[in-house]
Amino acid sequence: MGKTLFDKLWNRHVIYGKEGEPQLLYVDLHLIHEVTSPQAFEGLRMENRPLRRPDKTFATMDHNVPTEDIFNIQDLVAKKQIEALQTNCAEFGVTLADMGSDRQGIVHMVGPETGLTQPGKVIVCGDSHTATHGAFGAIGFGIGSSEVEHVFATQTIWQQKPKSMGIEIKGKLPKGVYAKDIILHLIATYGVAFGTGYAVEYYGETIQNMSMEERMTICNMAIEGGAKMGMMAPDETTFEYVRGREYAPTDMEKAISDWKTLQTDPDAEYDLHIEMDASTLEPYVTWGTNPEMGVPFSRAFPEIKDMNYERAYEYMGLKPGQKAEQIELGYVFIGSCTNARLSDLEEAARIVKGNKVKNNIRALVVPGSRQVRNAAESIGLDKIFIAAGFEWREPGCSMCLGMNPDQVPDGVHCASTSNRNFEGRQGKGARTHLVSPAMAAAAAINGHFIDIRKEAVISGGN
Protein backbone atom coordinates (compact mmCIF):
# COMPACT_ATOMS: atom_id res chain seq x y z
CA MET A 1 0.00 0.00 0.00
CA GLY A 2 1.16 3.53 -0.78
CA LYS A 3 2.13 6.19 1.73
CA THR A 4 0.47 9.49 2.54
CA LEU A 5 2.47 12.71 2.58
CA PHE A 6 2.29 12.60 6.37
CA ASP A 7 3.62 9.03 6.51
CA LYS A 8 6.57 9.95 4.30
CA LEU A 9 7.46 13.00 6.38
CA TRP A 10 7.09 11.17 9.69
CA ASN A 11 9.07 8.10 8.63
CA ARG A 12 11.99 10.24 7.46
CA HIS A 13 12.40 11.66 10.95
CA VAL A 14 11.91 8.68 13.27
CA ILE A 15 15.10 8.00 15.24
CA TYR A 16 13.76 5.47 17.70
CA GLY A 17 10.51 3.84 18.77
CA LYS A 18 7.99 1.22 17.74
CA GLU A 19 4.77 1.86 15.84
CA GLY A 20 1.88 2.55 18.20
CA GLU A 21 4.22 3.91 20.87
CA PRO A 22 5.80 7.36 21.31
CA GLN A 23 8.64 7.80 18.84
CA LEU A 24 11.69 10.03 18.94
CA LEU A 25 11.74 12.46 16.01
CA TYR A 26 14.60 14.56 14.68
CA VAL A 27 13.80 18.28 14.49
CA ASP A 28 15.06 20.21 11.45
CA LEU A 29 14.03 23.69 12.55
CA HIS A 30 13.24 25.11 15.99
CA LEU A 31 11.60 28.53 15.93
CA ILE A 32 11.42 30.45 19.21
CA HIS A 33 10.01 33.70 20.56
CA GLU A 34 10.15 35.66 23.80
CA VAL A 35 7.21 34.09 25.68
CA THR A 36 7.80 30.32 25.77
CA SER A 37 11.61 30.23 25.64
CA PRO A 38 12.89 31.87 28.89
CA GLN A 39 12.15 28.85 31.11
CA ALA A 40 13.75 26.50 28.58
CA PHE A 41 16.94 28.54 28.38
CA GLU A 42 17.08 28.71 32.17
CA GLY A 43 16.73 24.92 32.31
CA LEU A 44 19.81 24.54 30.09
CA ARG A 45 21.70 26.99 32.25
CA MET A 46 20.81 25.22 35.51
CA GLU A 47 21.99 21.86 34.13
CA ASN A 48 25.05 23.41 32.50
CA ARG A 49 23.98 22.05 29.11
CA PRO A 50 24.80 23.59 25.73
CA LEU A 51 22.13 24.24 23.12
CA ARG A 52 22.78 21.33 20.77
CA ARG A 53 22.10 22.94 17.37
CA PRO A 54 22.07 26.75 17.43
CA ASP A 55 22.27 26.61 13.63
CA LYS A 56 18.84 24.95 13.52
CA THR A 57 17.31 27.43 15.97
CA PHE A 58 15.95 30.85 15.01
CA ALA A 59 14.43 33.50 17.28
CA THR A 60 12.27 36.57 16.84
CA MET A 61 10.15 38.97 18.91
CA ASP A 62 6.40 39.02 18.32
CA HIS A 63 3.91 38.43 21.16
CA ASN A 64 4.88 41.32 23.45
CA VAL A 65 5.96 43.85 20.84
CA PRO A 66 4.18 47.24 21.13
CA THR A 67 3.16 47.98 17.55
CA GLU A 68 2.63 51.72 18.02
CA ASP A 69 6.20 52.27 19.23
CA ILE A 70 8.18 49.04 19.30
CA PHE A 71 10.88 50.34 21.62
CA ASN A 72 8.48 51.80 24.19
CA ILE A 73 7.74 48.69 26.27
CA GLN A 74 5.75 49.74 29.34
CA ASP A 75 4.78 46.31 30.67
CA LEU A 76 7.55 45.08 32.98
CA VAL A 77 6.93 41.37 32.33
CA ALA A 78 6.96 41.91 28.56
CA LYS A 79 10.14 43.97 28.81
CA LYS A 80 11.80 41.29 30.92
CA GLN A 81 10.87 38.54 28.44
CA ILE A 82 12.20 40.51 25.48
CA GLU A 83 15.45 41.34 27.27
CA ALA A 84 15.79 37.69 28.32
CA LEU A 85 15.53 36.52 24.71
CA GLN A 86 18.21 38.98 23.66
CA THR A 87 20.50 37.79 26.46
CA ASN A 88 19.79 34.10 25.90
CA CYS A 89 20.34 34.22 22.15
CA ALA A 90 23.66 35.99 22.62
CA GLU A 91 24.79 33.48 25.27
CA PHE A 92 23.74 30.33 23.39
CA GLY A 93 24.63 31.48 19.87
CA VAL A 94 21.10 31.63 18.45
CA THR A 95 20.32 33.91 15.50
CA LEU A 96 17.82 36.57 16.61
CA ALA A 97 15.60 38.77 14.45
CA ASP A 98 15.66 41.54 17.03
CA MET A 99 13.37 44.50 17.58
CA GLY A 100 13.48 46.81 14.58
CA SER A 101 15.55 44.49 12.39
CA ASP A 102 14.56 43.79 8.79
CA ARG A 103 13.75 40.17 9.68
CA GLN A 104 11.67 40.76 12.82
CA GLY A 105 8.02 39.78 12.81
CA ILE A 106 5.55 37.10 13.81
CA VAL A 107 7.48 33.84 14.06
CA HIS A 108 5.20 31.98 11.62
CA MET A 109 5.78 34.63 8.98
CA VAL A 110 9.51 35.04 9.50
CA GLY A 111 10.18 31.32 8.96
CA PRO A 112 8.70 31.22 5.44
CA GLU A 113 9.98 34.69 4.47
CA THR A 114 13.59 33.85 5.26
CA GLY A 115 13.43 30.49 3.51
CA LEU A 116 13.95 28.58 6.75
CA THR A 117 10.60 26.88 6.25
CA GLN A 118 11.04 24.24 3.55
CA PRO A 119 9.36 21.05 2.33
CA GLY A 120 10.36 17.86 4.09
CA LYS A 121 11.23 19.41 7.44
CA VAL A 122 9.97 18.78 10.96
CA ILE A 123 9.42 22.25 12.42
CA VAL A 124 8.50 22.97 16.04
CA CYS A 125 7.87 26.13 18.03
CA GLY A 126 6.49 26.98 21.45
CA ASP A 127 3.36 28.30 19.79
CA SER A 128 0.16 26.50 18.78
CA HIS A 129 0.00 27.95 15.26
CA THR A 130 3.17 26.21 14.10
CA ALA A 131 0.88 24.21 11.81
CA THR A 132 1.22 27.20 9.45
CA HIS A 133 4.50 25.76 8.13
CA GLY A 134 2.74 22.61 6.97
CA ALA A 135 1.64 24.56 3.90
CA PHE A 136 5.13 23.89 2.52
CA GLY A 137 4.91 20.11 2.75
CA ALA A 138 6.41 19.99 6.22
CA ILE A 139 5.42 18.71 9.64
CA GLY A 140 4.82 21.68 11.91
CA PHE A 141 3.36 21.61 15.41
CA GLY A 142 3.42 23.57 18.63
CA ILE A 143 5.21 22.42 21.78
CA GLY A 144 5.30 23.42 25.45
CA SER A 145 8.16 25.06 27.34
CA SER A 146 9.49 21.76 28.74
CA GLU A 147 9.56 20.36 25.20
CA VAL A 148 11.32 23.53 24.01
CA GLU A 149 14.07 22.73 26.50
CA HIS A 150 14.21 19.10 25.28
CA VAL A 151 14.69 20.28 21.69
CA PHE A 152 17.32 22.78 22.83
CA ALA A 153 19.27 19.98 24.51
CA THR A 154 18.82 17.14 22.00
CA GLN A 155 17.39 18.48 18.71
CA THR A 156 14.75 15.75 19.08
CA ILE A 157 11.24 15.35 20.45
CA TRP A 158 9.09 12.45 21.60
CA GLN A 159 5.73 12.23 19.85
CA GLN A 160 2.87 9.79 19.44
CA LYS A 161 2.11 9.46 15.75
CA PRO A 162 -1.33 10.92 14.93
CA LYS A 163 -3.78 9.29 12.55
CA SER A 164 -4.10 10.74 9.04
CA MET A 165 -7.00 12.74 7.63
CA GLY A 166 -7.36 13.86 4.03
CA ILE A 167 -9.57 16.86 3.23
CA GLU A 168 -10.16 17.16 -0.50
CA ILE A 169 -11.27 20.65 -1.55
CA LYS A 170 -12.71 21.07 -5.02
CA GLY A 171 -14.17 23.95 -6.99
CA LYS A 172 -13.35 27.57 -7.70
CA LEU A 173 -13.83 30.03 -4.86
CA PRO A 174 -16.65 32.50 -5.60
CA LYS A 175 -15.93 36.21 -5.75
CA GLY A 176 -15.62 37.66 -2.26
CA VAL A 177 -14.76 34.30 -0.69
CA TYR A 178 -11.24 33.49 0.50
CA ALA A 179 -8.99 30.86 2.06
CA LYS A 180 -10.05 32.12 5.50
CA ASP A 181 -13.65 31.24 4.67
CA ILE A 182 -12.64 27.69 3.74
CA ILE A 183 -11.11 26.97 7.12
CA LEU A 184 -13.89 28.78 9.01
CA HIS A 185 -16.42 26.69 7.07
CA LEU A 186 -14.67 23.43 7.90
CA ILE A 187 -14.53 24.27 11.60
CA ALA A 188 -18.14 25.50 11.70
CA THR A 189 -19.29 22.34 9.89
CA TYR A 190 -17.31 19.68 11.74
CA GLY A 191 -16.45 21.37 15.05
CA VAL A 192 -13.40 22.42 17.02
CA ALA A 193 -12.55 18.82 17.90
CA PHE A 194 -13.02 17.02 14.59
CA GLY A 195 -9.28 16.92 13.94
CA THR A 196 -8.27 15.72 17.40
CA GLY A 197 -5.64 13.01 17.09
CA TYR A 198 -5.10 13.62 13.37
CA ALA A 199 -2.55 15.08 11.02
CA VAL A 200 -4.61 16.74 8.29
CA GLU A 201 -3.60 16.99 4.64
CA TYR A 202 -5.54 19.54 2.58
CA TYR A 203 -5.48 18.79 -1.14
CA GLY A 204 -7.46 19.10 -4.36
CA GLU A 205 -7.83 21.57 -7.22
CA THR A 206 -8.77 24.46 -4.93
CA ILE A 207 -5.52 24.09 -2.98
CA GLN A 208 -3.46 23.65 -6.14
CA ASN A 209 -4.73 26.99 -7.45
CA MET A 210 -3.84 28.88 -4.27
CA SER A 211 -0.83 31.03 -3.53
CA MET A 212 1.47 30.04 -0.67
CA GLU A 213 0.01 32.84 1.42
CA GLU A 214 -3.50 31.44 1.03
CA ARG A 215 -2.28 27.95 1.85
CA MET A 216 -0.63 29.21 5.02
CA THR A 217 -3.93 30.74 6.16
CA ILE A 218 -5.65 27.35 6.00
CA CYS A 219 -2.86 25.39 7.69
CA ASN A 220 -2.54 28.10 10.34
CA MET A 221 -6.01 27.28 11.66
CA ALA A 222 -5.75 23.48 11.51
CA ILE A 223 -5.27 23.63 15.28
CA GLU A 224 -8.61 25.44 15.67
CA GLY A 225 -10.21 22.34 14.19
CA GLY A 226 -8.48 20.21 16.80
CA ALA A 227 -5.76 18.79 14.53
CA LYS A 228 -2.20 18.22 15.68
CA MET A 229 -0.95 19.62 12.39
CA GLY A 230 -2.08 20.61 8.90
CA MET A 231 -0.13 20.18 5.69
CA MET A 232 -0.20 20.41 1.90
CA ALA A 233 1.97 18.68 -0.67
CA PRO A 234 4.68 20.90 -2.18
CA ASP A 235 4.45 21.85 -5.84
CA GLU A 236 5.86 24.42 -8.28
CA THR A 237 4.15 27.21 -6.34
CA THR A 238 6.00 26.07 -3.22
CA PHE A 239 9.34 25.75 -4.98
CA GLU A 240 9.14 29.22 -6.52
CA TYR A 241 8.23 30.74 -3.15
CA VAL A 242 11.32 29.24 -1.49
CA ARG A 243 13.69 29.93 -4.39
CA GLY A 244 16.08 32.82 -3.82
CA ARG A 245 15.29 33.37 -0.16
CA GLU A 246 18.02 33.89 2.41
CA TYR A 247 18.09 30.33 3.74
CA ALA A 248 16.95 28.52 0.58
CA PRO A 249 19.01 25.43 -0.34
CA THR A 250 22.26 26.17 -2.16
CA ASP A 251 21.51 23.44 -4.69
CA MET A 252 17.88 24.28 -5.33
CA GLU A 253 17.39 21.81 -8.17
CA LYS A 254 18.63 18.92 -6.06
CA ALA A 255 16.29 19.96 -3.26
CA ILE A 256 13.34 20.22 -5.65
CA SER A 257 14.07 16.75 -6.99
CA ASP A 258 13.67 15.41 -3.47
CA TRP A 259 10.67 17.61 -2.61
CA LYS A 260 8.76 16.31 -5.63
CA THR A 261 8.60 12.90 -3.94
CA LEU A 262 6.62 14.40 -1.05
CA GLN A 263 3.20 13.55 -2.45
CA THR A 264 0.54 11.18 -1.20
CA ASP A 265 0.71 8.03 -3.33
CA PRO A 266 -2.37 7.27 -5.49
CA ASP A 267 -3.04 4.02 -3.62
CA ALA A 268 -2.50 5.47 -0.13
CA GLU A 269 -5.40 5.50 2.30
CA TYR A 270 -6.21 8.09 4.95
CA ASP A 271 -7.71 7.03 8.27
CA LEU A 272 -10.46 9.57 7.59
CA HIS A 273 -11.43 11.34 4.38
CA ILE A 274 -13.59 14.47 3.92
CA GLU A 275 -14.68 16.20 0.72
CA MET A 276 -15.64 19.85 0.36
CA ASP A 277 -17.02 21.93 -2.51
CA ALA A 278 -15.54 25.43 -2.31
CA SER A 279 -17.62 26.76 -5.22
CA THR A 280 -20.72 27.13 -3.02
CA LEU A 281 -19.05 28.94 -0.12
CA GLU A 282 -20.09 32.32 1.30
CA PRO A 283 -18.07 34.74 3.42
CA TYR A 284 -18.07 33.53 7.03
CA VAL A 285 -18.46 35.44 10.31
CA THR A 286 -18.09 33.94 13.78
CA TRP A 287 -20.74 34.97 16.30
CA GLY A 288 -19.61 33.11 19.44
CA THR A 289 -16.63 32.27 21.63
CA ASN A 290 -14.90 29.56 19.65
CA PRO A 291 -14.23 29.24 15.90
CA GLU A 292 -16.92 26.55 15.55
CA MET A 293 -19.54 29.20 16.29
CA GLY A 294 -19.60 30.70 12.82
CA VAL A 295 -22.13 31.09 10.01
CA PRO A 296 -22.21 31.97 6.31
CA PHE A 297 -23.05 35.65 5.93
CA SER A 298 -26.60 35.04 4.69
CA ARG A 299 -27.54 32.80 7.60
CA ALA A 300 -28.96 33.90 10.96
CA PHE A 301 -27.25 32.95 14.21
CA PRO A 302 -28.45 29.53 15.41
CA GLU A 303 -30.80 28.61 18.23
CA ILE A 304 -29.37 27.83 21.65
CA LYS A 305 -28.60 24.11 21.72
CA ASP A 306 -26.64 23.78 24.97
CA MET A 307 -25.09 25.70 27.87
CA ASN A 308 -22.03 26.59 25.79
CA TYR A 309 -24.23 28.40 23.28
CA GLU A 310 -26.14 30.13 26.07
CA ARG A 311 -22.93 31.36 27.67
CA ALA A 312 -21.51 32.44 24.31
CA TYR A 313 -24.59 34.52 23.47
CA GLU A 314 -24.50 36.13 26.91
CA TYR A 315 -20.80 36.98 26.64
CA MET A 316 -21.11 38.30 23.09
CA GLY A 317 -24.27 40.32 23.78
CA LEU A 318 -26.06 38.69 20.85
CA LYS A 319 -29.23 36.64 20.34
CA PRO A 320 -30.28 33.70 18.17
CA GLY A 321 -31.89 34.81 14.92
CA GLN A 322 -29.75 37.92 14.53
CA LYS A 323 -27.52 38.32 11.48
CA ALA A 324 -23.94 39.47 11.10
CA GLU A 325 -24.87 42.90 9.71
CA GLN A 326 -26.68 43.67 12.99
CA ILE A 327 -23.52 43.42 15.10
CA GLU A 328 -22.51 46.84 16.45
CA LEU A 329 -18.80 46.90 15.70
CA GLY A 330 -16.33 49.20 17.44
CA TYR A 331 -12.95 47.86 16.30
CA VAL A 332 -11.44 46.34 13.17
CA PHE A 333 -8.14 44.46 13.30
CA ILE A 334 -6.29 43.36 10.16
CA GLY A 335 -3.26 41.34 11.22
CA SER A 336 -2.01 38.14 12.94
CA CYS A 337 -0.13 35.07 11.66
CA THR A 338 -3.36 34.05 9.90
CA ASN A 339 -3.87 37.10 7.69
CA ALA A 340 -1.12 39.73 7.86
CA ARG A 341 0.76 38.87 4.70
CA LEU A 342 1.21 41.17 1.73
CA SER A 343 -1.63 39.66 -0.32
CA ASP A 344 -3.98 40.07 2.66
CA LEU A 345 -3.11 43.75 2.94
CA GLU A 346 -3.40 44.24 -0.82
CA GLU A 347 -6.92 42.80 -0.83
CA ALA A 348 -7.97 44.94 2.13
CA ALA A 349 -6.45 48.05 0.53
CA ARG A 350 -8.36 47.38 -2.69
CA ILE A 351 -11.61 47.69 -0.75
CA VAL A 352 -10.48 50.58 1.44
CA LYS A 353 -9.04 52.79 -1.32
CA GLY A 354 -10.97 56.04 -1.72
CA ASN A 355 -13.16 55.36 1.32
CA LYS A 356 -13.14 56.42 4.96
CA VAL A 357 -13.39 54.46 8.18
CA LYS A 358 -16.75 55.09 9.86
CA ASN A 359 -16.81 57.25 12.99
CA ASN A 360 -17.89 54.35 15.19
CA ILE A 361 -14.85 52.26 14.22
CA ARG A 362 -11.24 52.23 15.37
CA ALA A 363 -9.29 50.32 12.71
CA LEU A 364 -5.76 48.92 12.87
CA VAL A 365 -3.60 47.36 10.17
CA VAL A 366 -0.63 45.49 11.61
CA PRO A 367 1.72 43.90 9.04
CA GLY A 368 2.92 40.52 10.25
CA SER A 369 6.59 41.23 9.63
CA ARG A 370 9.07 43.97 8.80
CA GLN A 371 9.42 42.46 5.34
CA VAL A 372 5.68 42.72 4.72
CA ARG A 373 5.57 46.26 6.11
CA ASN A 374 8.43 47.39 3.87
CA ALA A 375 6.90 45.72 0.81
CA ALA A 376 3.49 47.26 1.53
CA GLU A 377 5.00 50.72 1.89
CA SER A 378 6.96 50.31 -1.34
CA ILE A 379 3.66 50.03 -3.25
CA GLY A 380 1.83 52.67 -1.24
CA LEU A 381 -0.54 50.51 0.80
CA ASP A 382 0.29 52.42 3.98
CA LYS A 383 -0.86 55.66 2.35
CA ILE A 384 -4.17 54.07 1.30
CA PHE A 385 -4.88 52.83 4.82
CA ILE A 386 -3.79 56.03 6.55
CA ALA A 387 -5.84 58.20 4.16
CA ALA A 388 -8.88 56.08 4.98
CA GLY A 389 -8.39 56.51 8.72
CA PHE A 390 -6.68 53.24 9.64
CA GLU A 391 -3.77 53.11 12.07
CA TRP A 392 -0.67 51.75 10.29
CA ARG A 393 1.40 49.85 12.83
CA GLU A 394 4.77 48.17 13.36
CA PRO A 395 4.93 44.36 12.95
CA GLY A 396 3.90 42.02 15.76
CA CYS A 397 1.16 39.76 17.06
CA SER A 398 -0.73 42.85 18.18
CA MET A 399 -4.47 42.55 18.77
CA CYS A 400 -4.60 38.81 18.11
CA LEU A 401 -4.08 38.28 21.83
CA GLY A 402 -4.17 40.42 24.96
CA MET A 403 -0.45 40.25 25.74
CA ASN A 404 0.57 43.69 24.51
CA PRO A 405 -0.92 47.21 24.50
CA ASP A 406 -3.17 46.49 21.47
CA GLN A 407 -6.40 45.34 23.12
CA VAL A 408 -10.13 45.60 22.44
CA PRO A 409 -12.07 47.33 25.26
CA ASP A 410 -14.52 45.46 27.47
CA GLY A 411 -17.82 44.76 25.71
CA VAL A 412 -16.70 46.06 22.31
CA HIS A 413 -17.18 43.98 19.15
CA CYS A 414 -14.14 43.59 16.88
CA ALA A 415 -13.98 42.33 13.30
CA SER A 416 -10.69 40.45 13.36
CA THR A 417 -8.59 38.56 10.80
CA SER A 418 -6.98 36.51 13.57
CA ASN A 419 -7.60 32.87 14.48
CA ARG A 420 -9.24 32.73 17.91
CA ASN A 421 -12.40 34.28 19.34
CA PHE A 422 -12.22 32.91 22.88
CA GLU A 423 -13.50 34.93 25.84
CA GLY A 424 -10.96 37.64 26.62
CA ARG A 425 -8.65 36.67 23.76
CA GLN A 426 -8.29 40.26 22.53
CA GLY A 427 -8.60 41.81 25.98
CA LYS A 428 -10.86 41.48 29.01
CA GLY A 429 -14.48 41.36 27.85
CA ALA A 430 -13.52 41.76 24.18
CA ARG A 431 -16.01 40.35 21.67
CA THR A 432 -14.18 38.89 18.66
CA HIS A 433 -15.62 38.05 15.23
CA LEU A 434 -13.30 36.12 12.92
CA VAL A 435 -13.44 37.09 9.24
CA SER A 436 -11.29 37.45 6.12
CA PRO A 437 -9.24 40.62 5.52
CA ALA A 438 -11.73 41.73 2.85
CA MET A 439 -14.66 41.35 5.24
CA ALA A 440 -12.79 43.27 7.94
CA ALA A 441 -11.86 46.09 5.56
CA ALA A 442 -15.42 46.44 4.29
CA ALA A 443 -16.73 46.47 7.85
CA ALA A 444 -14.38 49.33 8.73
CA ILE A 445 -15.66 51.61 5.98
CA ASN A 446 -19.32 50.68 6.40
CA GLY A 447 -19.42 50.57 10.19
CA HIS A 448 -20.83 47.04 10.20
CA PHE A 449 -20.46 43.73 8.39
CA ILE A 450 -21.65 43.66 4.79
CA ASP A 451 -21.91 41.08 2.03
CA ILE A 452 -18.69 41.81 0.14
CA ARG A 453 -19.93 39.79 -2.81
CA LYS A 454 -22.14 42.79 -3.62
CA GLU A 455 -19.79 45.62 -4.56
CA ALA A 456 -22.55 48.23 -4.48
CA VAL A 457 -22.78 48.00 -0.70
CA ILE A 458 -19.23 49.29 -0.17
CA SER A 459 -19.67 52.95 0.67
CA GLY A 460 -17.42 55.76 1.81
CA GLY A 461 -17.73 58.66 4.19
CA ASN A 462 -18.77 58.94 7.82
UniProtKB/Swiss-Prot annotation:
Named cofactor requirement(s): [4Fe-4S] cluster
The positions annotated for binding [4Fe-4S] cluster are: 337, 397, 400
- Supply the PROSITE patterns for this chain: ACONITASE_1, ACONITASE_2
> What Gene3D superfamilies would the database entry show?
Aconitase, domain 3
- Tell me the GO BP annotations in alphabetical order: L-leucine biosynthetic process
The GO terms describing molecular function are: 3-isopropylmalate dehydratase activity; 4 iron, 4 sulfur cluster binding; metal ion binding
State the UniProt keywords alphabetically.
Answer: 4Fe-4S, Amino-acid biosynthesis, Branched-chain amino acid biosynthesis, Iron, Iron-sulfur, Leucine biosynthesis, Lyase, Metal-binding
Q: How is the cofactor bound?
A: Binds 1 [4Fe-4S] cluster per subunit.
| The keyword tRNA-binding is annotated on this UniProt entry | no
Q: Which reaction does it catalyse?
A: (2R,3S)-3-isopropylmalate = (2S)-2-isopropylmalate
The biological pathway it contributes to is:
Amino-acid biosynthesis; L-leucine biosynthesis; L-leucine from 3-methyl-2-oxobutanoate: step 2/4
Look up the EC number in the record and give it.
4.2.1.33
Record note on quaternary structure:
Heterodimer of LeuC and LeuD.
**Described purpose of this protein according to its UniProt entry:** Catalyzes the isomerization between 2-isopropylmalate and 3-isopropylmalate, via the formation of 2-isopropylmaleate.
Q: What family is it from?
A: Belongs to the aconitase/IPM isomerase family. LeuC type 1 subfamily.
Q: In its UniProt entry, what is this protein called?
A: 3-isopropylmalate dehydratase large subunit
Q: Its gene?
A: leuC
